[in-house]
Protein backbone atom coordinates (compact mmCIF):
# COMPACT_ATOMS: atom_id res chain seq x y z
CA UNK A 1 0.00 0.00 0.00
CA UNK A 2 1.33 3.47 -0.87
CA UNK A 3 2.40 6.01 1.74
CA UNK A 4 -0.44 8.35 0.79
CA UNK A 5 -2.98 5.54 1.18
CA UNK A 6 -1.59 4.70 4.63
CA UNK A 7 -1.82 8.32 5.77
CA UNK A 8 -5.31 8.56 4.31
CA UNK A 9 -6.32 5.59 6.47
CA UNK A 10 -4.94 7.37 9.53
CA UNK A 11 -6.94 10.45 8.54
CA UNK A 12 -10.11 8.36 8.23
CA UNK A 13 -9.56 6.82 11.67
CA UNK A 14 -8.95 10.22 13.25
CA UNK A 15 -12.11 11.54 11.62
CA UNK A 16 -14.09 8.65 13.09
CA UNK A 17 -12.71 9.13 16.59
CA UNK A 18 -12.17 12.90 16.84
CA UNK A 19 -14.05 14.42 13.92
CA UNK A 20 -16.93 15.69 16.06
CA UNK A 21 -14.63 17.60 18.41
CA UNK A 22 -12.02 18.95 16.01
CA UNK A 23 -11.53 19.88 12.37
CA UNK A 24 -9.22 17.41 10.64
CA UNK A 25 -7.81 17.90 7.15
CA UNK A 26 -5.65 15.81 4.85
CA UNK A 27 -3.73 17.88 2.33
CA UNK A 28 -0.95 20.39 1.86
CA UNK A 29 0.65 21.72 5.06
CA UNK A 30 -0.02 25.32 6.19
CA UNK A 31 2.28 27.93 4.68
CA UNK A 32 3.65 28.98 8.06
CA UNK A 33 4.58 25.36 8.87
CA UNK A 34 6.52 25.04 5.61
CA UNK A 35 8.40 28.26 6.37
CA UNK A 36 9.25 27.25 9.93
CA UNK A 37 10.38 23.64 9.54
CA UNK A 38 11.22 23.61 5.82
CA UNK A 39 9.48 22.09 2.82
CA UNK A 40 11.33 18.76 3.11
CA UNK A 41 10.27 18.25 6.73
CA UNK A 42 6.69 19.43 6.21
CA UNK A 43 6.15 17.14 3.21
CA UNK A 44 3.61 17.45 0.44
CA UNK A 45 0.64 16.11 2.42
CA UNK A 46 -0.08 15.97 6.14
CA UNK A 47 -2.97 15.32 8.49
CA UNK A 48 -3.72 18.49 10.46
CA UNK A 49 -5.90 18.60 13.58
CA UNK A 50 -7.24 21.97 14.74
CA UNK A 51 -10.37 23.92 15.63
CA UNK A 52 -12.07 26.02 13.01
CA UNK A 53 -13.57 29.43 13.78
CA UNK A 54 -15.04 31.44 10.93
CA UNK A 55 -16.10 34.27 13.22
CA UNK A 56 -13.86 36.93 14.66
CA UNK A 57 -11.76 39.72 13.26
CA UNK A 58 -10.87 38.36 9.83
CA UNK A 59 -13.03 40.86 7.94
CA UNK A 60 -12.05 43.70 10.26
CA UNK A 61 -8.34 43.02 9.76
CA UNK A 62 -8.77 43.07 5.95
CA UNK A 63 -6.20 40.37 5.40
CA UNK A 64 -7.94 38.95 2.34
CA UNK A 65 -8.55 40.34 -1.15
CA UNK A 66 -11.52 42.67 -1.59
CA UNK A 67 -13.28 43.51 -4.83
CA UNK A 68 -12.57 47.00 -6.04
CA UNK A 69 -15.42 49.45 -6.47
CA UNK A 70 -16.71 49.30 -10.07
CA UNK A 71 -15.84 52.12 -12.42
CA UNK A 72 -18.94 54.15 -13.23
CA UNK A 73 -17.80 56.57 -15.84
CA UNK A 74 -17.75 56.33 -19.58
CA UNK A 75 -18.46 53.60 -22.07
CA UNK A 76 -18.19 49.87 -21.62
CA UNK A 77 -15.61 49.60 -24.39
CA UNK A 78 -12.02 48.95 -23.44
CA UNK A 79 -9.65 51.78 -24.28
CA UNK A 80 -5.97 51.01 -23.95
CA UNK A 81 -4.76 52.77 -27.04
CA UNK A 82 -5.32 56.49 -26.95
CA UNK A 83 -5.15 58.54 -30.09
CA UNK A 84 -2.10 58.28 -32.34
CA UNK A 85 -2.33 62.04 -32.86
CA UNK A 86 -2.43 63.14 -29.23
CA UNK A 87 -1.46 61.79 -25.83
CA UNK A 88 -4.82 60.94 -24.29
CA UNK A 89 -4.37 57.29 -23.33
CA UNK A 90 -6.60 56.24 -20.45
CA UNK A 91 -5.40 52.97 -18.96
CA UNK A 92 -7.89 52.89 -16.09
CA UNK A 93 -10.36 51.07 -18.33
CA UNK A 94 -8.37 47.88 -17.87
CA UNK A 95 -10.50 47.14 -14.82
CA UNK A 96 -13.61 46.80 -16.97
CA UNK A 97 -12.46 43.45 -18.34
CA UNK A 98 -10.82 41.78 -15.36
CA UNK A 99 -11.73 40.73 -11.86
CA UNK A 100 -9.95 43.56 -10.13
CA UNK A 101 -8.90 42.30 -6.71
CA UNK A 102 -7.19 44.96 -4.65
CA UNK A 103 -4.82 43.61 -2.04
CA UNK A 104 -4.37 45.94 0.91
CA UNK A 105 -1.11 44.11 1.49
CA UNK A 106 0.29 40.76 0.55
CA UNK A 107 -0.12 38.09 3.19
CA UNK A 108 2.21 35.10 3.55
CA UNK A 109 -0.67 32.82 4.52
CA UNK A 110 -3.66 31.38 2.70
CA UNK A 111 -7.24 32.46 3.26
CA UNK A 112 -8.36 29.20 4.91
CA UNK A 113 -5.51 29.47 7.41
CA UNK A 114 -7.16 32.56 8.91
CA UNK A 115 -9.89 30.32 10.34
CA UNK A 116 -7.58 27.84 12.05
CA UNK A 117 -7.39 27.86 15.86
CA UNK A 118 -5.31 25.75 18.20
CA UNK A 119 -6.54 23.03 20.55
CA UNK A 120 -5.35 22.67 24.18
CA UNK A 121 -1.88 21.16 24.37
CA UNK A 122 -2.92 18.45 26.86
CA UNK A 123 -5.72 17.34 24.51
CA UNK A 124 -3.26 17.09 21.62
CA UNK A 125 -0.81 15.07 23.73
CA UNK A 126 -3.55 12.67 24.81
CA UNK A 127 -4.38 11.93 21.16
CA UNK A 128 -0.68 11.46 20.35
CA UNK A 129 -0.35 8.95 23.20
CA UNK A 130 -3.59 7.11 22.38
CA UNK A 131 -3.29 3.44 21.52
CA UNK A 132 -4.97 3.62 18.12
CA UNK A 133 -2.45 6.20 16.87
CA UNK A 134 0.52 4.32 18.34
CA UNK A 135 -0.53 1.11 16.59
CA UNK A 136 -1.53 2.70 13.29
CA UNK A 137 0.59 2.01 10.22
CA UNK A 138 1.49 4.78 7.85
CA UNK A 139 4.13 7.05 6.41
CA UNK A 140 4.05 10.78 6.93
CA UNK A 141 3.05 13.01 9.81
CA UNK A 142 0.03 14.04 11.83
CA UNK A 143 0.31 17.62 13.13
CA UNK A 144 -1.75 19.10 15.96
CA UNK A 145 -2.21 22.87 16.01
CA UNK A 146 -2.04 23.99 19.66
CA UNK A 147 -3.24 27.12 21.42
CA UNK A 148 0.06 27.92 23.15
CA UNK A 149 -1.54 27.81 26.60
CA UNK A 150 1.35 25.86 28.13
CA UNK A 151 4.49 27.39 29.57
CA UNK A 152 6.54 26.60 26.46
CA UNK A 153 3.97 28.23 24.12
CA UNK A 154 3.64 25.09 22.01
CA UNK A 155 2.26 25.89 18.58
CA UNK A 156 2.41 22.50 16.84
CA UNK A 157 2.92 18.89 17.88
CA UNK A 158 4.09 16.30 15.35
CA UNK A 159 3.60 12.54 15.33
CA UNK A 160 5.62 11.00 12.50
CA UNK A 161 5.02 7.45 11.29
CA UNK A 162 8.30 5.63 10.71
CA UNK A 163 8.81 1.86 10.32
CA UNK A 164 12.16 1.81 12.16
CA UNK A 165 12.12 4.77 14.56
CA UNK A 166 9.96 6.51 17.13
CA UNK A 167 9.69 10.07 15.86
CA UNK A 168 8.18 13.12 17.57
CA UNK A 169 8.41 16.84 16.94
CA UNK A 170 7.39 19.99 18.77
CA UNK A 171 7.28 23.54 17.41
CA UNK A 172 7.05 26.40 19.88
CA UNK A 173 7.02 30.17 19.67
CA UNK A 174 9.97 31.89 21.35
CA UNK A 175 8.77 35.48 21.24
CA UNK A 176 10.51 38.54 19.84
CA UNK A 177 14.25 38.89 20.22
CA UNK A 178 16.84 41.40 19.00
CA UNK A 179 19.10 40.34 16.16
CA UNK A 180 22.23 40.66 18.28
CA UNK A 181 21.01 37.82 20.54
CA UNK A 182 20.99 35.37 17.62
CA UNK A 183 24.44 33.82 18.12
CA UNK A 184 25.99 30.42 17.47
CA UNK A 185 26.55 29.89 21.19
CA UNK A 186 22.90 30.51 22.01
CA UNK A 187 21.68 28.20 19.25
CA UNK A 188 24.02 25.35 20.22
CA UNK A 189 22.86 25.74 23.81
CA UNK A 190 19.23 25.35 22.68
CA UNK A 191 20.19 22.36 20.55
CA UNK A 192 21.65 20.65 23.60
CA UNK A 193 24.88 19.28 22.15
CA UNK A 194 27.55 20.04 19.60
CA UNK A 195 26.00 19.76 16.12
CA UNK A 196 27.45 17.37 13.58
CA UNK A 197 26.04 19.47 10.76
CA UNK A 198 24.39 22.87 10.48
CA UNK A 199 22.34 24.06 7.51
CA UNK A 200 21.88 27.83 7.31
CA UNK A 201 19.72 29.94 5.01
CA UNK A 202 19.61 33.73 5.34
CA UNK A 203 17.02 35.64 3.36
CA UNK A 204 17.54 39.33 2.57
CA UNK A 205 14.58 41.41 1.40
CA UNK A 206 15.59 43.76 -1.41
CA UNK A 207 12.03 45.03 -1.85
CA UNK A 208 8.59 43.55 -1.08
CA UNK A 209 8.77 41.39 -4.22
CA UNK A 210 12.48 40.56 -4.37
CA UNK A 211 14.62 38.48 -2.03
CA UNK A 212 18.15 37.10 -1.96
CA UNK A 213 18.66 33.73 -0.27
CA UNK A 214 22.15 32.80 0.92
CA UNK A 215 22.58 29.19 2.05
CA UNK A 216 25.47 26.97 3.10
CA UNK A 217 26.35 23.95 5.24
CA UNK A 218 28.84 23.92 8.11
CA UNK A 219 30.35 21.15 10.23
CA UNK A 220 31.94 23.55 12.72
CA UNK A 221 31.08 23.32 16.41
CA UNK A 222 30.18 27.03 16.35
CA UNK A 223 29.11 27.72 12.75
CA UNK A 224 29.24 31.16 11.20
CA UNK A 225 25.73 32.63 10.94
CA UNK A 226 26.68 35.04 8.15
CA UNK A 227 28.68 33.92 5.14
CA UNK A 228 28.92 36.02 2.00
CA UNK A 229 32.05 34.40 0.57
CA UNK A 230 31.23 30.85 -0.52
CA UNK A 231 27.48 30.54 0.01
CA UNK A 232 24.92 29.54 -2.59
CA UNK A 233 22.91 32.59 -3.64
CA UNK A 234 19.42 32.50 -5.14
CA UNK A 235 17.55 35.57 -6.34
CA UNK A 236 13.76 35.41 -6.20
CA UNK A 237 11.55 38.06 -7.74
CA UNK A 238 7.81 38.06 -8.35
CA UNK A 239 6.32 40.30 -11.03
CA UNK A 240 2.58 40.90 -10.90
CA UNK A 241 0.85 42.48 -13.90
CA UNK A 242 -1.01 44.89 -11.62
CA UNK A 243 2.35 46.24 -10.41
CA UNK A 244 3.54 47.18 -13.90
CA UNK A 245 5.14 50.62 -13.68
CA UNK A 246 4.91 53.65 -16.00
CA UNK A 247 8.14 52.70 -17.74
CA UNK A 248 6.76 49.46 -19.20
CA UNK A 249 3.01 50.10 -18.99
CA UNK A 250 2.70 50.94 -22.68
CA UNK A 251 4.09 47.56 -23.75
CA UNK A 252 1.85 45.69 -21.32
CA UNK A 253 -1.16 47.64 -22.60
CA UNK A 254 -0.32 46.60 -26.17
CA UNK A 255 -0.03 42.99 -25.04
CA UNK A 256 -3.41 43.23 -23.33
CA UNK A 257 -4.96 44.63 -26.49
CA UNK A 258 -3.63 41.65 -28.43
CA UNK A 259 -5.05 39.27 -25.83
CA UNK A 260 -8.48 40.92 -26.02
CA UNK A 261 -8.45 40.86 -29.83
CA UNK A 262 -7.62 37.17 -29.73
CA UNK A 263 -10.40 36.53 -27.20
CA UNK A 264 -12.92 38.32 -29.43
CA UNK A 265 -11.81 36.33 -32.48
CA UNK A 266 -12.17 33.03 -30.63
CA UNK A 267 -15.55 34.09 -29.23
CA UNK A 268 -16.80 35.03 -32.68
CA UNK A 269 -15.72 31.76 -34.30
CA UNK A 270 -17.24 29.79 -31.43
CA UNK A 271 -20.58 31.53 -31.95
CA UNK A 272 -20.42 30.92 -35.70
CA UNK A 273 -19.89 27.21 -35.08
CA UNK A 274 -22.96 27.22 -32.84
CA UNK A 275 -25.05 28.94 -35.49
CA UNK A 276 -25.14 32.38 -33.86
CA UNK A 277 -25.02 35.15 -36.45
CA UNK A 278 -23.41 38.40 -35.28
CA UNK A 279 -20.62 40.83 -36.02
CA UNK A 280 -17.38 40.43 -34.09
CA UNK A 281 -16.56 42.84 -31.28
CA UNK A 282 -13.66 45.25 -31.12
CA UNK A 283 -13.37 46.93 -27.73
CA UNK A 284 -9.84 48.27 -27.39
CA UNK A 285 -9.84 51.64 -29.16
CA UNK A 286 -10.35 55.16 -27.84
CA UNK A 287 -11.97 56.26 -31.06
CA UNK A 288 -10.63 58.44 -33.86
CA UNK A 289 -12.31 60.72 -36.38
CA UNK A 290 -12.60 58.78 -39.62
CA UNK A 291 -11.57 61.75 -41.78
CA UNK A 292 -8.49 62.14 -39.61
CA UNK A 293 -7.83 58.44 -39.93
CA UNK A 294 -8.14 58.55 -43.74
CA UNK A 295 -5.67 61.42 -43.91
CA UNK A 296 -3.27 59.65 -41.53
CA UNK A 297 -3.41 56.43 -43.57
CA UNK A 298 -2.72 58.29 -46.82
CA UNK A 299 0.17 60.17 -45.24
CA UNK A 300 1.61 56.99 -43.70
CA UNK A 301 1.55 55.13 -47.01
CA UNK A 302 2.91 57.92 -49.20
CA UNK A 303 5.58 59.46 -46.95
CA UNK A 304 9.12 58.23 -47.24
CA UNK A 305 10.13 56.26 -44.15
CA UNK A 306 13.15 57.28 -42.17
CA UNK A 307 16.27 55.22 -42.54
CA UNK A 308 17.03 55.01 -38.82
CA UNK A 309 16.12 51.62 -37.48
CA UNK A 310 18.69 51.36 -34.70
CA UNK A 311 20.24 53.72 -32.20
CA UNK A 312 23.32 51.60 -31.61
CA UNK A 313 26.67 53.35 -31.60
CA UNK A 314 29.37 50.73 -32.21
CA UNK A 315 29.80 48.76 -29.00
CA UNK A 316 28.37 51.38 -26.66
CA UNK A 317 26.25 50.07 -23.81
CA UNK A 318 23.08 51.85 -22.80
CA UNK A 319 21.28 52.01 -19.50
CA UNK A 320 18.36 49.59 -19.68
CA UNK A 321 15.89 52.17 -18.35
CA UNK A 322 17.01 54.64 -20.99
CA UNK A 323 16.63 52.04 -23.73
CA UNK A 324 13.09 51.17 -22.60
CA UNK A 325 12.20 54.86 -22.61
CA UNK A 326 13.59 55.27 -26.13
CA UNK A 327 11.76 52.17 -27.31
CA UNK A 328 8.47 53.87 -26.44
CA UNK A 329 9.21 56.71 -28.87
CA UNK A 330 11.40 54.90 -31.38
CA UNK A 331 10.95 55.75 -35.06
CA UNK A 332 8.81 53.12 -36.77
CA UNK A 333 10.11 52.26 -40.23
CA UNK A 334 7.78 49.54 -41.46
CA UNK A 335 4.38 50.38 -42.87
CA UNK A 336 2.39 47.75 -40.98
CA UNK A 337 3.98 48.80 -37.68
CA UNK A 338 2.76 52.35 -38.32
CA UNK A 339 -0.66 51.08 -39.36
CA UNK A 340 -0.96 49.15 -36.08
CA UNK A 341 -0.63 52.42 -34.18
CA UNK A 342 -3.44 53.90 -36.27
CA UNK A 343 -5.85 51.00 -36.68
CA UNK A 344 -5.88 49.89 -33.04
CA UNK A 345 -7.48 53.24 -32.14
CA UNK A 346 -10.71 52.50 -34.01
CA UNK A 347 -13.69 52.73 -31.72
CA UNK A 348 -15.60 49.69 -32.93
CA UNK A 349 -15.57 46.76 -35.29
CA UNK A 350 -17.53 48.81 -37.82
CA UNK A 351 -14.92 51.59 -37.77
CA UNK A 352 -12.11 49.05 -38.02
CA UNK A 353 -13.70 47.46 -41.08
CA UNK A 354 -14.12 50.88 -42.72
CA UNK A 355 -10.50 51.72 -41.88
CA UNK A 356 -9.26 48.63 -43.71
CA UNK A 357 -11.40 49.55 -46.74
CA UNK A 358 -9.83 53.02 -46.78
CA UNK A 359 -6.41 51.40 -46.46
CA UNK A 360 -6.99 49.07 -49.41
CA UNK A 361 -8.37 51.90 -51.56
CA UNK A 362 -5.29 53.96 -50.83
CA UNK A 363 -3.02 51.02 -51.67
CA UNK A 364 -4.79 50.48 -54.99
CA UNK A 365 -4.96 54.13 -56.10
CA UNK A 366 -1.97 55.89 -54.58
CA UNK A 367 1.67 55.73 -55.42
CA UNK A 368 2.94 53.91 -52.33
CA UNK A 369 6.37 55.14 -51.37
CA UNK A 370 6.55 53.41 -48.01
CA UNK A 371 6.54 49.81 -49.24
CA UNK A 372 5.99 47.31 -46.40
CA UNK A 373 8.97 45.17 -45.46
CA UNK A 374 7.28 42.96 -42.87
CA UNK A 375 6.27 39.47 -43.96
CA UNK A 376 2.69 39.40 -42.70
CA UNK A 377 -0.57 38.95 -44.56
CA UNK A 378 -1.53 42.64 -44.56
CA UNK A 379 1.86 43.62 -45.99
CA UNK A 380 1.40 41.11 -48.81
CA UNK A 381 -2.10 42.37 -49.58
CA UNK A 382 -0.89 45.99 -49.74
CA UNK A 383 2.01 45.04 -52.00
CA UNK A 384 -0.20 43.03 -54.36
CA UNK A 385 -2.80 45.82 -54.50
CA UNK A 386 -0.10 48.38 -55.30
CA UNK A 387 1.24 46.11 -58.06
CA UNK A 388 -2.27 45.63 -59.49
CA UNK A 389 -2.14 41.87 -58.94
CA UNK A 390 -5.03 41.61 -56.52
CA UNK A 391 -8.66 42.67 -56.65
CA UNK A 392 -9.94 44.91 -53.87
CA UNK A 393 -10.48 42.67 -50.81
CA UNK A 394 -13.80 42.84 -49.00
CA UNK A 395 -13.21 41.84 -45.40
CA UNK A 396 -15.91 40.04 -43.49
CA UNK A 397 -16.36 38.24 -40.21
CA UNK A 398 -13.28 38.23 -38.02
CA UNK A 399 -10.87 39.04 -40.87
CA UNK A 400 -10.26 42.68 -39.78
CA UNK A 401 -9.45 41.50 -36.26
CA UNK A 402 -7.21 38.71 -37.54
CA UNK A 403 -5.20 41.11 -39.71
CA UNK A 404 -4.91 43.56 -36.82
CA UNK A 405 -3.79 40.81 -34.44
CA UNK A 406 -1.03 39.66 -36.78
CA UNK A 407 0.49 43.10 -37.34
CA UNK A 408 0.18 43.91 -33.64
CA UNK A 409 2.05 40.78 -32.62
CA UNK A 410 4.85 41.63 -35.02
CA UNK A 411 5.09 45.28 -33.99
CA UNK A 412 5.21 44.50 -30.26
CA UNK A 413 7.88 41.88 -30.84
CA UNK A 414 9.99 44.53 -32.59
CA UNK A 415 9.62 46.80 -29.54
CA UNK A 416 11.03 44.09 -27.30
CA UNK A 417 13.70 43.21 -29.85
CA UNK A 418 14.85 46.83 -29.85
CA UNK A 419 15.08 46.87 -26.03
CA UNK A 420 17.00 43.63 -25.71
CA UNK A 421 19.48 44.29 -28.50
CA UNK A 422 20.09 47.98 -27.77
CA UNK A 423 20.73 47.31 -24.09
CA UNK A 424 23.08 44.46 -25.07
CA UNK A 425 21.18 42.04 -22.83
CA UNK A 426 20.86 39.45 -25.56
CA UNK A 427 21.17 39.06 -29.29
CA UNK A 428 18.38 38.82 -31.80
CA UNK A 429 19.41 35.22 -32.37
CA UNK A 430 18.45 34.34 -28.79
CA UNK A 431 14.99 35.80 -29.28
CA UNK A 432 14.73 33.99 -32.62
CA UNK A 433 15.96 30.66 -31.36
CA UNK A 434 13.71 30.58 -28.34
CA UNK A 435 10.63 31.92 -29.99
CA UNK A 436 10.91 30.01 -33.24
CA UNK A 437 11.92 26.46 -33.71
CA UNK A 438 13.95 27.09 -36.86
CA UNK A 439 15.03 29.84 -39.20
CA UNK A 440 12.57 30.96 -41.85
CA UNK A 441 13.06 31.43 -45.55
CA UNK A 442 11.68 34.94 -45.70
CA UNK A 443 12.73 35.55 -49.28
CA UNK A 444 10.82 32.72 -50.93
CA UNK A 445 7.63 33.94 -52.61
CA UNK A 446 6.53 30.33 -52.93
CA UNK A 447 6.47 29.77 -49.19
CA UNK A 448 3.31 31.77 -48.53
CA UNK A 449 2.34 30.08 -45.26
CA UNK A 450 5.57 31.44 -43.80
CA UNK A 451 4.46 35.00 -44.47
CA UNK A 452 2.08 34.94 -41.56
CA UNK A 453 4.75 33.71 -39.19
CA UNK A 454 6.78 36.61 -37.83
CA UNK A 455 10.16 36.39 -36.19
CA UNK A 456 8.96 35.07 -32.88
CA UNK A 457 6.49 32.40 -34.05
CA UNK A 458 7.13 28.69 -33.79
CA UNK A 459 7.67 27.35 -37.30
CA UNK A 460 5.95 24.14 -38.30
CA UNK A 461 7.92 21.67 -40.37
CA UNK A 462 5.08 20.81 -42.73
CA UNK A 463 6.07 21.26 -46.37
CA UNK A 464 3.79 23.28 -48.58
CA UNK A 465 2.10 21.07 -51.18
CA UNK A 466 3.05 22.00 -54.69
CA UNK A 467 5.84 24.29 -53.57
CA UNK A 468 7.32 24.26 -57.04
CA UNK A 469 4.20 25.82 -58.57
CA UNK A 470 3.96 29.56 -59.12
CA UNK A 471 1.53 30.95 -56.56
CA UNK A 472 -0.23 34.26 -56.33
CA UNK A 473 -2.59 35.59 -53.75
CA UNK A 474 -5.48 34.89 -56.09
CA UNK A 475 -4.62 31.21 -56.41
CA UNK A 476 -3.46 29.89 -53.08
CA UNK A 477 -4.33 26.50 -51.66
CA UNK A 478 -3.04 26.38 -48.08
CA UNK A 479 -2.29 23.19 -46.27
CA UNK A 480 -4.40 22.59 -43.20
CA UNK A 481 -2.33 21.81 -40.14
CA UNK A 482 -4.17 19.11 -38.24
CA UNK A 483 -2.26 19.88 -35.05
CA UNK A 484 -3.76 23.36 -34.74
CA UNK A 485 -7.21 24.81 -34.33
CA UNK A 486 -7.92 26.85 -37.45
CA UNK A 487 -11.15 28.64 -38.12
CA UNK A 488 -12.15 28.38 -41.74
CA UNK A 489 -15.30 27.65 -43.63
CA UNK A 490 -15.94 24.83 -46.05
CA UNK A 491 -14.49 26.96 -48.84
CA UNK A 492 -11.08 27.19 -47.18
CA UNK A 493 -9.37 25.72 -50.23
CA UNK A 494 -11.53 27.52 -52.78
CA UNK A 495 -9.25 30.57 -52.94
CA UNK A 496 -7.10 32.99 -51.03
CA UNK A 497 -8.18 33.84 -47.49
CA UNK A 498 -7.78 37.50 -46.62
CA UNK A 499 -6.53 36.63 -43.15
CA UNK A 500 -5.30 33.72 -41.13
CA UNK A 501 -6.01 32.72 -37.53
CA UNK A 502 -4.80 29.70 -35.62
CA UNK A 503 -6.01 29.55 -32.03
CA UNK A 504 -3.14 27.46 -30.69
CA UNK A 505 -0.51 29.37 -32.64
CA UNK A 506 -1.79 32.74 -31.41
CA UNK A 507 -1.74 31.51 -27.81
CA UNK A 508 1.88 30.43 -28.21
CA UNK A 509 2.91 33.78 -29.66
CA UNK A 510 1.15 35.79 -26.96
CA UNK A 511 2.63 33.52 -24.29
CA UNK A 512 6.11 34.11 -25.70
CA UNK A 513 5.59 37.87 -25.69
CA UNK A 514 4.39 37.69 -22.09
CA UNK A 515 7.51 35.72 -21.17
CA UNK A 516 9.69 38.33 -22.89
CA UNK A 517 7.89 41.13 -21.03
CA UNK A 518 8.21 39.40 -17.65
CA UNK A 519 11.92 38.85 -18.28
CA UNK A 520 12.23 42.57 -18.96
CA UNK A 521 10.45 43.38 -15.69
CA UNK A 522 12.76 41.06 -13.74
CA UNK A 523 15.85 42.60 -15.33
CA UNK A 524 14.62 46.14 -14.66
CA UNK A 525 14.10 45.38 -10.97
CA UNK A 526 17.57 43.81 -10.79
CA UNK A 527 19.01 46.93 -12.41
CA UNK A 528 17.14 49.39 -10.20
CA UNK A 529 17.66 47.66 -6.86
CA UNK A 530 20.88 45.66 -7.28
CA UNK A 531 22.64 47.07 -10.37
CA UNK A 532 24.15 43.69 -11.25
CA UNK A 533 25.11 44.63 -14.81
CA UNK A 534 27.47 41.70 -15.28
CA UNK A 535 24.76 39.06 -14.88
CA UNK A 536 22.06 40.45 -17.18
CA UNK A 537 23.11 38.38 -20.19
CA UNK A 538 23.18 35.12 -18.25
CA UNK A 539 19.89 35.84 -16.51
CA UNK A 540 18.24 36.88 -19.76
CA UNK A 541 19.45 33.73 -21.50
CA UNK A 542 18.31 31.47 -18.66
CA UNK A 543 14.83 32.98 -18.47
CA UNK A 544 14.16 33.13 -22.21
CA UNK A 545 15.29 29.55 -22.80
CA UNK A 546 12.58 28.22 -20.50
CA UNK A 547 9.37 27.05 -22.19
CA UNK A 548 6.85 29.88 -21.77
CA UNK A 549 3.75 29.10 -19.74
CA UNK A 550 0.60 29.33 -21.85
CA UNK A 551 -1.28 32.58 -21.28
CA UNK A 552 -4.80 32.89 -22.67
CA UNK A 553 -5.86 35.90 -20.61
CA UNK A 554 -4.12 38.68 -18.71
CA UNK A 555 -5.47 40.37 -15.59
CA UNK A 556 -3.86 42.29 -12.75
CA UNK A 557 -3.37 39.13 -10.67
CA UNK A 558 -1.35 37.27 -13.29
CA UNK A 559 2.22 36.90 -12.07
CA UNK A 560 5.58 35.46 -13.00
CA UNK A 561 8.27 34.25 -10.60
CA UNK A 562 12.00 34.35 -11.28
CA UNK A 563 14.26 32.13 -9.18
CA UNK A 564 17.85 32.04 -10.40
CA UNK A 565 21.29 31.23 -9.02
CA UNK A 566 23.97 33.89 -8.70
CA UNK A 567 27.61 33.89 -7.69
CA UNK A 568 28.17 35.18 -4.15
CA UNK A 569 30.67 37.84 -5.20
CA UNK A 570 27.97 39.68 -7.18
CA UNK A 571 25.91 40.43 -4.06
CA UNK A 572 28.60 40.55 -1.37
CA UNK A 573 28.99 44.33 -1.34
CA UNK A 574 25.24 44.86 -1.45
CA UNK A 575 24.55 42.62 1.57
CA UNK A 576 27.63 43.30 3.66
CA UNK A 577 26.69 44.65 7.09
CA UNK A 578 22.96 44.08 6.64
CA UNK A 579 20.84 41.86 8.89
CA UNK A 580 18.87 39.14 7.10
CA UNK A 581 15.12 39.61 6.85
CA UNK A 582 14.61 35.99 7.89
CA UNK A 583 16.83 33.12 9.02
CA UNK A 584 16.38 29.37 8.86
CA UNK A 585 19.01 27.38 10.78
CA UNK A 586 18.93 23.60 11.25
CA UNK A 587 21.34 21.72 13.54
CA UNK A 588 21.65 17.93 13.49
CA UNK A 589 23.33 15.52 15.90
CA UNK A 590 23.10 11.74 15.74
CA UNK A 591 24.51 8.45 16.96
CA UNK A 592 23.66 4.82 16.32
CA UNK A 593 20.40 4.93 18.29
CA UNK A 594 19.15 8.49 18.21
CA UNK A 595 18.96 11.53 15.99
CA UNK A 596 18.34 15.04 17.30
CA UNK A 597 17.28 17.84 14.98
CA UNK A 598 16.68 21.46 15.98
CA UNK A 599 15.43 24.08 13.55
CA UNK A 600 15.48 27.78 14.42
CA UNK A 601 13.34 30.14 12.39
CA UNK A 602 13.60 33.92 12.67
CA UNK A 603 11.47 36.36 10.70
CA UNK A 604 11.12 40.14 10.88
CA UNK A 605 7.35 39.69 10.60
CA UNK A 606 4.95 37.28 12.26
CA UNK A 607 4.07 34.91 9.42
CA UNK A 608 1.07 33.41 11.23
CA UNK A 609 -2.48 34.65 10.57
CA UNK A 610 -3.52 37.38 13.07
CA UNK A 611 -6.08 35.38 15.03
CA UNK A 612 -3.60 32.54 15.42
CA UNK A 613 -0.67 34.80 16.24
CA UNK A 614 -2.57 36.58 19.01
CA UNK A 615 -2.58 33.35 21.01
CA UNK A 616 1.15 33.80 21.57
CA UNK A 617 2.38 36.60 23.78
CA UNK A 618 5.11 38.77 22.32
CA UNK A 619 6.79 42.07 23.00
CA UNK A 620 5.94 45.18 21.03
CA UNK A 621 8.39 45.36 18.14
CA UNK A 622 7.57 49.01 17.53
CA UNK A 623 9.29 50.04 20.78
CA UNK A 624 12.62 48.48 19.77
CA UNK A 625 14.91 50.46 17.48
CA UNK A 626 17.27 47.68 16.36
CA UNK A 627 16.37 44.73 14.12
CA UNK A 628 14.17 42.21 15.92
CA UNK A 629 12.86 38.81 14.93
CA UNK A 630 9.81 36.73 15.71
CA UNK A 631 11.40 33.40 16.57
CA UNK A 632 10.30 29.78 16.58
CA UNK A 633 12.14 26.61 17.56
CA UNK A 634 11.39 23.12 16.28
CA UNK A 635 12.78 20.10 18.15
CA UNK A 636 12.57 16.65 16.60
CA UNK A 637 13.83 13.45 18.20
CA UNK A 638 14.02 10.17 16.29
CA UNK A 639 14.89 7.04 18.32
CA UNK A 640 15.50 3.49 17.11
CA UNK A 641 12.61 1.13 17.90
Curated annotation (Swiss-Prot):
By sequence similarity, the record places it as follows:
Belongs to the ZWILCH family.
> Which residues does this entry mark as bearing Phosphoserine?
312
Q: What is the protein name stated in its UniProt record?
A: Protein zwilch
One BP term from GO: cell division
Please tell me where this protein is predominantly located. Answer: cytoplasm
Q: Name one GO cellular component term.
A: kinetochore
The annotated consequence of gene deletion is: Lagging chromosomes at anaphase and precocious sister chromatid separation upon activation of the spindle checkpoint. In spermatocytes the number of Golgi structures are not affected but they show a mild defect in shape.
Q: Which gene encodes it?
A: Zwilch
What are the top taxonomic ranks of the organism? Eukaryota, Metazoa, Ecdysozoa, Arthropoda, Hexapoda
Pfam families in the record, alphabetically? Zwilch
Which keywords, in A-to-Z order, does the entry hold? Cell cycle, Cell division, Centromere, Chromosome, Cytoplasm, Cytoskeleton, Kinetochore, Mitosis, Phosphoprotein
Subunit: Component of the RZZ complex composed of rod, Zw10 and Zwilch.
Q: Could you tell me where this protein is found in the cell? A: Cytoplasm; Chromosome, Centromere, Kinetochore; Cytoplasm, Cytoskeleton, Spindle
Function, as annotated, reads: Essential component of the mitotic checkpoint, which prevents cells from prematurely exiting mitosis. Required for the assembly of the dynein-dynactin, Mad2 complexes and spindly/CG15415 onto kinetochores. Its function related to the spindle assembly machinery is proposed to depend on its association in the RZZ complex. Failure to assemble the complex due to the absence of any one of its components, results in the incorrect redistribution of the remaining components to diverse membrane compartments.
Fetch the PANTHER family from UniProt.
PROTEIN ZWILCH HOMOLOG
This protein's species is Drosophila melanogaster
Looking at the keywords, is Phosphoprotein present? yes
